[in-house]
Amino acid sequence: MDRRTLVTFAAGACLLEPLAVRAQQAVKVFRIGLLVPRSELTPADRIDLEALRTGLRDLGWVEGKNLIIEIRWADVNPQRQRELAAELKALPVALILALGTTTIRAARDGAPGLPVVMINAGDPVGARFVASLARPGGDLTGTSAAGEEVLGKQVELLSVAVPQLKRAGVLMNSANPANGFFFDAMSLRAKTLGLRLDRIDVTVEGELDGAIARAKGGALIVVNDSMFLRNRVHIVELTLRSHVPSIFGSPEYVAAGGLMSYLSSNVWHWRTAASFVDKILKGAMPADIPVEQPTKFELMINLKTAKRLGITIPQSLLARADELIR
């Protein structure tokens, strides 16, 4: 390489270096919010968050490179949830991911006009989050819990596990706006099975002992709720103490000693939420993105608890289980 060529090459390199730096600096970093309705990080939360991050990475969104996730742990206080949603909007964030009906409502009300990606919404149409699943028509879209199918199946599975069952209580947080939908969905299935359902509403944690005692002599269905999840160990202890077979909407109860859980796949909800984030960050409007419903459901059975309750789980039910605790 002669001197003239070397000088030309060096000059070209000097010109290219600033261009490369500017190109690197031009990468836009998006900030999104995540509102979670509890104050503690559970083992299941870690799995769910990893599913979200994996889904985002698969779509090209990498934390620290082109994405920042602002997580707010909101507990179960709706007012605090609204305040945190407003805080996220002020940062600002491009959108808020919100888990569960009460938190979704808080995100909508606390950050009006901001896109909200719903995760596992109980009844998004009935709660007036969206006009329809196919055409949401507002600032909210995301995943629905397929509540009617899941809740009806919980009733059916409980009746299979306890064939002589005639009555079951349904434990609900009276603050949850989707309760009417939940109870109606379960009642329809219970009627075909010859079961009587009793709605058991609680408002505060101090009412749990008396509420679960009302289910004695029958069984119990515990509807998903952040307050219940936070008190899952106590709730499970109460069901065992009262000798009440129970089914839950989260595997964390079964890990704590509950009899059974049946739910749509949490991993599916969180990974699918990533696809909604991707579309909105790329310019799509929530109003035009259809709400998605799950196709994968998971059954978990605690055989140690079944033995303690004196229940023999039918082989047909064991064969359907995704996980057995022995």
PLM ranges: what are they?
Residues M1-R326:
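Short hydrophobic alpha-helices and adjacent helix-cap/hinge residues
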